[in-house]
Amino acid sequence: DPMNFKLLINDLRFDTTNIKYVADVSIATISFDPKNSELQDAANKLVGWCRSNGMALNTKKTKELVIHFGKRVDKKSIPYIVINETNIDRVESFKLLGVYFSSDPSWSTHVDYIVSKAARRLFVICQLVRAGISKCGIVLVYCSLVRSILEYACPVWHCGLKKSQSLETEAVQKRCLRILYPDLSYANALSITGLERLDERRESIVRKLFNQAKNPDHDLNKLLPHKNSDTYKPVTRDCYPYTIPKARTSSSGHSFV
């Protein structure tokens, strides 16, 4: 029973970040020295907890994802996590709650995944057009069946997209509108259907969530950067109210970490 399991794992307590969702548990930690990670200690505690509660950890379904920025990092030199005398598989990407995280870090794997999945569903749009369904109805189906895939959890990954990746997602919507209005330009088709560009919609969603998170009572408020000390200085283009961490590369500056 997933509900009983969720209640059972609620007493898991580690010094790491724990993500618990129904029948899944994910453990994350930050390490400046990859050779001295806290994950092995956390894994040992998890194994002990499982034994105490009459359960066994499935090592075949357990994966390790090492996320790093430096090009000089030799992942082969990083010790594998060992559970029950078995090395845990180390993967280049992993899907967590529907979003692919990669070791680069980048969003290439996730973008490829959502674009491919959404593009396959355009077949349904073609069938509806052939069946003579109204275009208004088809647009509703598109928003529910296709666009929802391209926007799922976008506050996590939108700001880290490259321009080419953003265009990849936009191309799916362009194909859909070309099926409905083959003689119109993309801009005119957007105007007629009342749809927005996907990048503009994602930007709006992200800004809305960010404004909500600025409320001290919001669950995500603790994840925001520290505010600048000079709170009386007016907010201008050159004066941002939050302290932004410095990044040496564009990939680290736009990553999810």
Language model features: what each stretch is:
Residues 10, 25-51, 71:
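Catalytic palm subdomain of template-directed nucleic-acid polymerases
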Residues 224, 228-257:
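Low-complexity, glycine/alanine/valine/leucine- and proline-rich hydrophobic stretches
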Residues 1-16, 106, 143, 147:
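Conserved pre-motif C helix in the palm subdomain of viral-like polymerases
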Residues 12, 23-25, 43-46, 50, ...:
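Mobile genetic element proteins and their domesticated derivatives, centered on retroelements
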Residues 145-160, 182-184, 212:
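Extended, well-ordered alpha-helical segments in internal regulatory regions
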Residues 47, 51-66, 72, 165-232:
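Short, charged alpha-helical motifs in flexible N/C-terminal segments and linkers
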Residues 41-42, 48, 56-92:
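Short, conserved micro-motifs composed of acidic
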Residues 1-2, 31-39, 52-59, 87-89, ...:
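Conserved, non-catalytic sequence blocks in retroelement Pol enzymes and Pol-derived host proteins
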